[in-house]
Amino acid sequence: MPTKAKLRFLLITISFEILFKAAISQPIEGKWRGAIHYDNIEVPFAFEVLKSTDSLTELLIISSGDTMEINNARLKGDSLFVPLGVFDSELRIRYTNAEMSGEWHKNYQQLPGPLFTATYKQDIFSNHSVSMAPVEIEDRWRITLMQPSGGISKALGLFEQHENQIASTILTEVGDYRYFEGMIMNDSIVMSSFDGVHAFLFAGSYHVTGWKGRLYYEPGYYENWEAMYDNTYELTDPFELITTEPGASRPYYDILTAGGKYNIINTDSLAGKVVVIQLMGTWCPNSFDQTNYLINWCKSKPEDVKMIAVSYEPGDKSYAHQRLEKYKKQMKIPYPMYVGGSLSKGQAALAFPTIDRINAFPTLVMVDKKGFIRYICSYFNGPATGDYYLQFGTEFEKRIEELRNE
């Protein structure tokens, strides 16, 4: 090959290498607008790329009053893999300088996840007007959720409004929806929430009698909702939704942990103690919030109180044990945790045959020193609910002291 031709070939090769490296440079640091796509519905959320190297990226996912810090996102070529906190899900992304696209994947599900996209330096509701809002939704609203099957459930919406901006949470009798943020535009409202497990879009418009709209949960599924202003409305207290008579029933600990050979609760260690049993799942954000509360409570837990957790997971037992071990390590949980079985409230209820039902994950079952079930906290109001979260702590600790003093 002639010398000039060799030189030209070398220059072309170097140019391609430079262009290739530029194309797969690290994601741009700064604020991004992410979105999960459900068919023609988009669930937006904010995140920030804090720091990026050749192999790792640090991100911060932001949702109203909540943040999820991620310091172990992995770079591989033009792909970015973002594990979503302690949950077994991740964003699988291909990126250019100012755009990302990919999939939101839950590792315990075989089907492909919803589409994910992101754009650099864009507000999460950038396609909406930011004029002054003529309609107000601040304070508390009684919400009715209507399922496609015909089922109806009640909820309480707590809203804070600053001009067009909305911060909110929605409480139900199976747990709260955690942190929403959004906007009011003229007579319409739109709010979103993304926590790594759920991506919710709450959208509607104002009518003469109140608000009406849809709450989108996942591809192909939504519930209609209606909201009426009611500043005295309350849900049933979580400690009163399901009750039991003192001395009426005991937990079946062998059934509780599915009788696994290496997964057995030592009941001798519980004798003469107040026992708190948390029924939970590593896939559940409400369980995550309650577990954080219990971790902190255990720092000053009395010696005559025992705390245990029993988890109900998707997939087989091998997966469940692996998930629970990782979850316990990541969260530095100081109390014993056991695999209870597959993800089923019916399965969880088998260990408590005299109780009407297990209403939700998480559920707390409180057992007195004689071994009888005394109290059941049937759902959890997490930190997004403000005063209701503080009220849970007060009521929980009051019942602990009552059982200790018997």
Locate each region found by the language model.
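Bacterial Sec-dependent N-terminal signal peptides
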Residues: 1-31
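Central antiparallel beta-sheet cores of small beta-barrel/beta-sandwich binding domains
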Residues: 27-95, 127-128, 135-203
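Structural microenvironment flanking redox-active thiols in thiol-disulfide oxidoreductases
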Residues: 289-332, 344-351
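Thiol-/selenol-based redox modules, centered on thioredoxin-like
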Residues: 360-406
